[in-house]
Amino acid sequence: MFRLDPRLEQDTHGVTSFALSRVLLMNDARYPWLILVPNRNGLSELHDLNAADQARLNDEIIIVSRGLARMFTPEKINVGALGNIVRQLHIHIVARNTDDPAWPGPVWGHSPAVPYAADALAERRSRLTAEFG
């Protein structure tokens, strides 16, 4: 049975699931920030995936990147797999704009997260679910 890292569980809200990955919304209202987590236990690196799952994950990254681009018309889409704190393989996909608080630097560690208010979270999740299923 697949287990999501407790830190990801604590810091995100579920949006949907794809063939390979769970799609999670980072609980930071300042950024359109999604995280893909492949439903495979014991993985920490991209190369830990088999070839078919690598291709599927790449497809899912493109789906999310294009969807965020349509929804938010960002200046840039950042895609990254760091894993220095949370070892479980997960991919961050963040729509960035020149007026966001961390621009042009990374969103990680810039400042404490600003959690979604309940109504804003419901609206954001509804839009994301409509876009991604």
Predicted regions and their residues:
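HIT superfamily nucleotide-processing domains
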Residues: 1-133
